[in-house]
Amino acid sequence: MSSHKAGVTGVAERYATALYELAEDRGALDQVSADLRSLKAMLDESGDLRRVIASPVIGRDDQRKALTALAEKAGFHEIVRNFLGVVAAKHRSFAVPGMIGAFLERLAARRGEVTARIVSATALTSAQKSALTTALNKATGNTVTIDASVDPALLGGMVVRVGSRMVDSSLSTKLKRLQLAMKGVG
């Protein structure tokens, strides 16, 4: 399983690098990155779309047609439309989420930006995201972009990851620590 994951990561990195270099050469980094963020949002919201790109049962032509139609309807840049067509034709659609992530990470590194991955028990409000962004900008000395997700299993609080650093202030972790402390008392 881990070797498959490493293979997906390698495929995603190679395709993302090619897309990045093409977009940079054509002066379209901003448009391509905006399109990829939109595609990421679509993938996050649509289980059906995730299944279409991940399914080995769906043929290359059908995946290509689906991705091309989606890209055209969304008004994506020609580079992104062609890229998605090539990815589907090469039967690499399963790696699209990784390709998007690798592309955006490379762009962020070029711009001196850092991504903070925040997992919270409930969705963050705009005010909370703004306050977190300000605090993280100050703490890291970099421009921070927030990648927020929700995990109700946290019960409350949040887990913040910036690079290799992590702060876990979730209620579930605090309860686990309390449970361990109580075991030592008896």
UniProtKB/Swiss-Prot annotation:
Gene Ontology molecular function terms on file: proton-transporting ATP synthase activity, rotational mechanism
Membrane topology: Peripheral membrane protein
Provenance organism: Rhodospirillum rubrum (strain ATCC 11170 / ATH 1.1.1 / DSM 467 / LMG 4362 / NCIMB 8255 / S1)
Name of the protein: ATP synthase subunit delta
Family under the similarity heading: Belongs to the ATPase delta chain family.
Presence of keyword Ion transport: yes
Sorted UniProt keywords: ATP synthesis, Cell inner membrane, Cell membrane, CF(1), Hydrogen ion transport, Ion transport, Membrane, Transport
Gene3D superfamilies for this protein: N-terminal domain of the delta subunit of the F1F0-ATP synthase
Subunit structure: F-type ATPases have 2 components, F(1) - the catalytic core - and F(0) - the membrane proton channel. F(1) has five subunits: alpha(3), beta(3), gamma(1), delta(1), epsilon(1). CF(0) has four main subunits: a(1), b(1), b'(1) and c(10-14). The alpha and beta chains form an alternating ring which encloses part of the gamma chain. F(1) is attached to F(0) by a central stalk formed by the gamma and epsilon chains, while a peripheral stalk is formed by the delta, b and b' chains.
Disulfide bonds: none
PROSITE patterns hit by this protein: ATPASE_DELTA
